[in-house]
């Protein structure tokens, strides 16, 4: 799937994204289990809300973590998350 700055993602319907106090990290819950999202993966995924464009997610993260060029890492994570079915492109 070609990903660009205007692509909008949302969490796939059978997943629920939340902070898990027991693990002290964000997780994706699904009927068969849980995916742990330590550090940057949780920071990226918490910005996937069905309205934010990829470019906005990158800009927000670079604002939150100044001095870091995060574009490549964010794009790579979003591509992997999409490939694993955790997120899907928002359908208008």
Positions of the model-derived regions?
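Acidic, low-complexity/disordered tracts enriched in E/D and polar residues
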Residues: 1-46, 91
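Long, charge-rich, low-complexity alpha-helical segments
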Residues: 33-92
């Amino acid at each position: 799937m070609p990903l660009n700055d205007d692509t909008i993602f949302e969490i796939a319907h059978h997943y629920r994204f939340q902070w898990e106090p027991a693990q002290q990290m964000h997780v994706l819950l699904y009927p068969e289990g849980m995916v742990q999202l330590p550090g940057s993966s949780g920071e990226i995924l918490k910005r996937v809300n069905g309205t934010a464009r990829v470019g906005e997610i990158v800009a927000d993260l670079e604002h939150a973590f100044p001095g870091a060029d995060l574009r490549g890492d964010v794009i790579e994570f979003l591509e992997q998350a999409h490939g694993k079915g955790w997120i899907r492109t928002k359908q208008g």
